[in-house]
Amino acid sequence: MITDDQIPRAAADERRTAQAFQEKLRDRYDVAQMIMFGSRARGDHGPDSDLDLAVVLHGRRGDFIDTKLDMAGIAFDVMMETGVLVQPFPLWDGDLAHPELFTNSALIRKIAEEGIRLG
């Protein structure tokens, strides 16, 4: 995984949107880190592409669906402010180290290997 200071620019829109999203998450979640992945991380996104963010949370694993739906509501508020839609993907401490525990283990591996750690 690389960090956002190792790339020419994790464009201003992505940084601003991710920061706004993280600020809104603080009231409800203990965020360990956020990782940008997908087309915006690869740099092959279009103007209407969403911003895929893996949100790694501290603590005991919660319910994925409930957490994702709650985060999607927060993401909608951020989209109204920034014009960029965030697609949150909640993970918990240790999940990236054990992709084999997931039905979509290839996605977890991609996030761990190719994602851009923000902040």
Residue map of PLM features:
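Short beta-strand->loop micro-motif that forms the acidic, two-metal-ion catalytic signature
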Residues: 51-56
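Catalytic core of pol beta-like nucleotidyltransferases
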Residues: 1-32, 42-47, 58-119
